[in-house]
Amino acid sequence: MPTVADRPVDYRELMKKVERLVATIQKLGDVEATVRRVAAEIIAQFRDELGLVGGRVYQRDGSDYVVRDTFGDAKPVEAGRRVPRAYAPIDACIQNGVVYMEPDDPGVDRALEESLGVREFACIEVADEDYILAFNVDPVASRDDIVFSLQILRNAINQKVRQERIEEVFREARKIQSSILPRKAPPYPPFEMEIGRAHV
């Protein structure tokens, strides 16, 4: 498998492979489980081509984003750790959908990022801002490569989430429909048809 050191990567082909992988992942019951599973599976299968080696799942909770899980080679982080929605890199991620920032970029809290086991801040927003995925970056990957990879991931995960939400809407509609329809046909009284005789 090609690595980030063997660039350039064929991103069109990589995107197709990611989409095929995502299509094989079964529905897991809720959006959080889907986001976790899809992100972990993509990183496990394509980490070398993506230049992403692990990450953290954050869920929105009021004015904060809360760590729910880690995957890949990410440093273990205690679940429940909170990062303010107003933190500049997170705000940029919410505004743009994808963000990649270096340690010296304005607004990056180097101490915070180091405590999470990362130097760069690379993340995507998914599921209508309900979740953020922050990634550990391969040190030999370039900024442009990482941004392309983040866009591929975001598109794939959002597509899966939208698909599952649409399926859920149809399931609920079928439940409502079945609840208002009678379980069996109502009884009707017998009736007779009288055919008149024609007179000439």
Describe every region a protein language model picked out:
Residues 164-199:
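… and, occasionally, acidic/histidine-rich disordered N-termini of signaling adaptors
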Residues 105-130:
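Helix-to-coil/beta transition segments that act as allosteric "coupling" elements at the rims
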Residues 43-47, 51-61, 193:
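Short, hydrophobic-rich beta-strand element in sensory/regulatory alpha-beta domains
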Residues 1-37:
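Signal-transmission linkers at sensory-effector interfaces
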Residues 56-79:
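GAF sensory/regulatory domain recognition
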Residues 71-106:
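Acidic/proline- and glycine-rich, intrinsically disordered low-complexity segments
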Residues 2-9, 122-124, 132-151:
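Regulatory loop-to-helix N-cap segments in sensory/regulatory domains
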Residues 139-140, 148-167:
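Signal-transmission/dimerization alpha-helices at domain junctions
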